[in-house]
Design a protein with these regions (language model features):
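Conserved MFS/SLC helix-loop-helix module at the cytosolic interface between two early adjacent transmembrane helices
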Residues: 63-102
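Short amphipathic helix-loop junctions that connect adjacent transmembrane helices
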Residues: 31-48, 238-255
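Juxtamembrane intracellular "pre-TM" segments in multi-pass secondary transporters
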Residues: 2-9, 188-225, 247
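Helix-to-loop junctions at the C-terminal end of transmembrane segments
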Residues: 65-77, 269-283
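C-terminal transmembrane helical hairpin of 12-TM major facilitator-type secondary transporters
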Residues: 284-327
Length: 409
């Protein structure tokens, strides 16, 4: 429990390190999980189908699990639920390494999806220890730590996977257990006893959580922004590699460099630029600016005619990296201090749902245009779709801004 502002300030590095380790552990398995799933079948169509099943199982588990963990953290505190999440993720990683059946893999990956809700708890933790004015910057720092983890993790995972396919999962499990020990001995609690509330199973219902989020002090349009913007981002993750292969003939190396550039840029924006931007603009304005930047960026990615343009657009889309942290800070500020876990759990649940929906939209859309010759502008259809989603987000954000007018600093 925090008694002083000094203690609250000291807690931020603790949660940032915990999130960095957590994301590095998750990132380690990214290059090898599809290969592991493929090892259970020699048929390429079956490999694609079962990897889709694994991805959907994880996403649905995250959708269902995030509100549950959020509600539990409002009752018992952030620290014990974070520790539970670390333990569950560790078990799931070791389970993946040890299982010798496809259904066993699906079961333990589903467990991992439920426990991945601890990211929502980390966001609630930051909300607990931050004033409303600090939240956007600190959510940005947390996002930067996630980005660093996702940059480091896949590189290490790819190198270890080349040695042994199961080795990255043992490493991920070990990192997560290290996080469990770190959290147990070092991480302080952020939620005072007098700000906790009784647990009710209805609070763990994801549909109820999303409905409550939409009704939260006029932030309904922002919930739409979270959904549409998140869907656009997950569609990008779904199609990026194959899009660049179809349009520019890129292989694994070129795609690896480009994804690293995207990740490094996101870290710089959220970890370095977010603070100075917030000194000049309020989060409401940053959301608008970021969505304009993002809508333009997606359109230009789709319209790119040469590979180098993909890198140029990363720079054009710099402000797009400010949207998530800014929206989260506005939603968090609208929630009561007793409901931060439930609120952040609902946001995480919505993102989990979008992660399930995105492959169902992005992959078929890319497949529908994949027959066009290399370099054809029509191959950019998935990115044009993402741009349209961001325009929709922009309309909702403007609607919110008109209801809650805030001028730049």
């Amino acid at each position: 429990m925090f008694q002083t502002l000094r203690n609250r300030e000291a807690a931020m590095p603790f949660i940032m390190l915990a999130v960095l380790i957590d994301m590095a552990a998750i990132g380690v398995i990214i290059p090898v999980l599809p290969v592991l799933v493929a090892s259970f079948s020699a048929n390429q169509a079956d490999q694609a189908y079962w990897y889709g099943v694994v991805a959907v199982a994880f996403g649905m588990a995250n959708f269902l699990g995030s509100p549950l963990l959020g509600a539990l953290s409002d009752r018992f505190g952030r620290r014990p639920v974070l520790l539970l999440g670390f333990m569950g993720l560790g078990i799931s990683f070791f389970g993946i390494a040890l299982t010798d059946t496809l259904w066993g893999l699906i079961v333990v990956r589903t467990l991992g999806g439920v426990m991945q809700g601890n990211i929502a708890i980390a966001n609630a933790y930051v909300a607990d220890i931050s004033s409303p004015e600090q939240r956007a910057k600190r959510f940005g720092l947390l996002g930067a730590m996630m980005g660093v983890g996702f940059i480091i993790g896949p590189v290490v995972g790819g190198l270890m996977g080349a040695i042994n396919l199961h080795l990255p999962f043992y490493l991920a499990g070990g990192l997560t257990l290290l996080n469990l020990l770190y959290g147990y001995f070092v991480l302080p609690e952020s939620l005072p006893l007098d700000k906790r509330k009784p647990f009710a199973w209805r609070d763990a219902n994801p549909i109820k959580a999303l409905r409550g989020l939409a009704q939260l002090k006029g932030v309904g349009p922002l919930v739409g922004v979270v959904a549409l913007s998140g869907l656009a981002q997950f569609v990008l993750y779904t199609v990026w590699v194959l899009y660049n292969a179809f349009k520019f003939g890129w292989g694994a190396e070129e795609n690896g460099y480009s994804l690293t550039a995207v990740g490094v840029t996101a870290v710089l924006v959220q970890g370095v630029l977010m603070g100075p931007l917030l000194k000049r603009f309020k989060p409401q304005r940053l959301v608008i600016m970021g969505l304009v930047s993002s809508a333009l960026g997606y359109f230009l990615w789709g319209a790119a005619t040469q590979g180098w343009m993909m890198y140029a657009v990363i720079g054009i889309n710099l402000l797009g990296g400010t949207v998530t942290a800014s929206v989260q800070s506005l939603i968090s500020s609208a929630a009561d201090s007793r409901n931060q876990g439930q609120t952040m759990g609902a946001v995480s649940s919505l993102n989990g749902l979008m992660a399930v929906v995105a492959p169902m939209l992005g992959a078929p859309l890319l497949a529908a245009v994949s027959h066009f010759p290399q370099g054809d502008w029509r191959i950019g259809a998935p990115f044009f779709f993402c741009s349209a989603l961001q325009v929709g987000s922009l309309v909702l954000a403007v609607l919110y801004l008109r209801r809650h007018p805030q001028s730049p600093r």
